[in-house]
Design a protein with these regions (language model features):
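Short, small-residue-biased leader/transition segments that mark boundaries at the very start
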Residues: 1-8
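Amphipathic alpha-helical linker/stalk segments
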Residues: 71-107
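C-terminal/domain-terminus segments
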Residues: 30, 128-145, 199-212
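Helix-turn-helix
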Residues: 24, 28, 32-66, 70
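Amphipathic alpha-helical segments used for helix-helix packing
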Residues: 89-98, 112-135, 186
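C-terminal peripheral helix-coil segments that are non-catalytic and often amphipathic
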Residues: 116, 120, 150-157, 170-217
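Amphipathic alpha-helical packing segments from all-alpha helical-bundle domains
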Residues: 105, 109-123, 133-160, 171-178
Length: 217
C-alpha cells in the first residue's frame, strides 16, 4: 500500500507533464501551420521548436493531419453545433406549415453566435480557409455548403408550399447556399475585429433574407 500511495503523486505529475507537453506541441504546430500551411509544414520543425522528440509528438498524434485536426476540430464542432441548433428551429417551423411567419430574429441570433465563435478562434478559421490544402480539412467549406444546401432545399420547398409558390430551381437554392457561406468567408478574411464583423454580417443577413423572401413568397 505504501508503494501504491507513493505512485499516485508520480502519476499525477506525469499527467500534468504530458498535458503541458501536448499543449506546447499544439502551440508550436499552430505557428508552423499558420506560417507554411499544412502541406509545407514540417513535424521535425514543430518538435524542434517545442524542444521535444518526434516520438513525443507521435505519442499524442497519429500523423500531421491528426495534429492539424486537433487544432481546428473543437472549433469546427462548436460551429456545427450552432448551425444545427438553428436548423432545428427552422425545421420545426416548416413542420408546422409556417402557421406563423418565419421568425427572422432567430437568423440574426444565429449570426451573432457564429460571428462571436469565429472571432474567438479567428486563427483557426483562417487555418481552415487558407492553410488546410492537403489535409482532411481541405474541403470542409464545400461540405458545409452541401450540408446547408440540403437544409435550404427542404426549407425552400416547405415555404413555397405554404405560400402556394412554384418550387425554386435547385441551382438557385445551391447558389444561395454558397452565398451564405461566402458572406462569412469574406467577413473573416477582410475584417479584423468582431464588432465591425457583426455589423457587416447583420447587413449581409438583411440582404440574404430579403432575397430569400423575394423568391418564396
Amino acid at each position: 500500500t505504501g508503494v501504491q500511495t507513493c505512485a499516485l503523486p508520480i502519476l499525477a505529475a506525469r499527467k500534468i507533464h504530458d498535458s503541458e507537453t501536448k499543449k506546447h506541441l499544439i502551440e508550436c504546430a499552430k505557428a508552423e501551420f499558420m506560417e507554411k500551411g499544412f502541406a509545407r509544414a514540417s513535424l521535425r520543425n514543430i518538435c524542434q521548436e517545442a524542444g521535444d522528440t518526434t516520438g513525443a509528438l507521435y505519442f499524442f498524434f497519429h500523423d500531421k493531419d491528426d495534429l492539424f485536426c486537433e487544432i481546428v476540430g473543437d472549433f469546427m464542432d462548436r460551429l456545427n453545433a450552432i448551425i444545427k441548433e438553428h436548423y432545428s428551429h427552422e425545421v420545426k417551423e416548416a413542420d408546422r406549415g409556417y402557421e406563423n411567419e418565419h421568425d427572422d430574429s432567430l437568423d440574426f441570433e444565429c449570426t451573432k453566435k457564429l460571428v462571436h465563435e469565429i472571432y474567438q478562434h479567428r486563427d483557426e478559421v483562417l487555418m481552415v480557409l487558407t492553410k488546410s490544402q492537403g489535409s482532411t480539412m481541405e474541403n470542409v467549406m464545400d461540405r458545409l455548403v452541401d450540408q446547408m444546401d440540403e437544409h435550404n432545399a427542404f426549407i425552400c420547398k416547405a415555404m413555397c408550399k405554404a405560400n402556394d409558390v412554384h418550387m425554386v430551381d435547385k441551382k438557385v437554392v445551391h447558389w444561395m447556399s454558397h452565398s451564405q457561406v461566402d458572406m462569412f468567408i469574406f467577413m473573416v478574411t477582410h475584417i479584423d475585429n468582431e464588432k465591425e464583423a457583426l455589423a457587416f454580417a447583420e447587413k449581409g443577413m438583411e440582404y440574404l433574407i430579403a432575397g430569400w423572401y423575394a423568391i418564396v413568397k
